[in-house]
Amino acid sequence: MLAMLSSSSAKYSKVVVTERTYACTDGVKLSTRHWSNDFESESNLRRTRKILCLHGWLDNSASFNRLAPCLLENLSLGSSSSDDTIKENVDIIPTEIVALDFPGHGLSSHKSVDGPPQLLAEYAYYAAELIEALQWGDNGSTANMVDGKTTHDNDTQQSETTINDNSGKESNKIILVGHSMGSGVAIVLCAAFPEWFSGLVLLEGGLVARSANDASRHVRSACQRRLRSNRTLFPNVNDGTSTSSSNTRAKVYSNLEAAIKARLSTTERMPGDQTLSYEAARDMVVRATLPANKNDNDNEAVVFRHDPRLQWPSLQYYTREQVKAFMRDVRTSTVPTCFLSAADGWPTDAWIESVVKDELQPVHLKRLSGSHHFHADPDTVGAVAREVVAFINELNS
């Protein structure tokens, strides 16, 4: 497991927040948000704990804006303590947390006209390519980082950043955290590349399973939606002037507050008794919008920047047999799993719950108070962080 730095060789300073963009081999640009504990050390700091966070459908990396710093603080304390004071004489493990925006979400680019906009395995692919770029997960490959800017807390100072050269097999293991759809991606990725991961944390999610008998009807529905909507989204595709989905027809909101209100209203229409705090909604909406008129600085109108194709039915889905196989593969790979659900979260059926218990067999299984975004809401993120920290500490024991 990870070696812990002694208090004499490291001193906690503050959280460093970094924004980076990576160019994938197919031209898609992935935007990422990084949090790390800023420390001073005289020893080799390459043995860094690595945590990769995957967000949910139509969310973005800002959904981890509260959980990531909370994890850093409590992991730096070496316990699940909720004490807000960072003491100088404690053992500190250098930790980096990275959350990506999936293609079509947040600040990442959209897929091309001919690219599948929403396939779970596609998201797993982009997470794998990001891991290569970070040189994590015992993976020596590299990718091209387009740009990088570093800020300390709320400072405006910015500087160029480079990818760390991490060495040591055990130090390169990743703790994978997924929320909702991101949990499904995390399960698929962990099942495919178990050697990369030391732990798997699933927040309010898992893999969605459909009956194999519905496959042809599902493909028909997806094809009809794509045929109908492509003509609107890509009217000039045949003359070569339209290469990606456009926001020119996106709904315009008078200002950021109106967009936040719309996001909150969407949550109210979701299944169950879901709620979303204003603070969490604002974090995600700020990252998910752009000015409606870039040439008019006085106009506060905004539009959502996400790829509208994300709201189409996917051309493919997993059957129950496949879902069970993915979860079984994670379990037999001996990657420990933490599964946390919310009391007022997304409703799940009895079959999924039984598969999680029987096939995945999490070593840490709890239901917490809160709603579907309990990791993003200020009132519930602390409890989520404590459970995740307890799980991570168990990995190191």
Language-model region placement:
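Flexible "cap/lid" loop of the alpha/beta hydrolase fold
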Residues: 188-191, 198-255
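N-terminal cap/lid segment of alpha/beta-hydrolase-fold proteins
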Residues: 8-29
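Active-site loop/oxyanion-hole signature of alpha/beta-hydrolase fold enzymes
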Residues: 25-26, 33, 38-39, 90-177, ...
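Catalytic histidine-centered segment of alpha/beta-hydrolase-like enzymes
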Residues: 371-381
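Gly/Ala-rich beta-loop-alpha elbow adjacent to hydrolase catalytic centers
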Residues: 178-182, 186
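Conserved alpha/beta-hydrolase catalytic His-Asp/Glu region
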Residues: 239-320
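Conserved HGGG/HGGXW glycine-rich cap/lid loop of the alpha/beta-hydrolase fold
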Residues: 33, 38-40, 44-110
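Conserved serine/cysteine hydrolase catalytic core
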Residues: 290-358
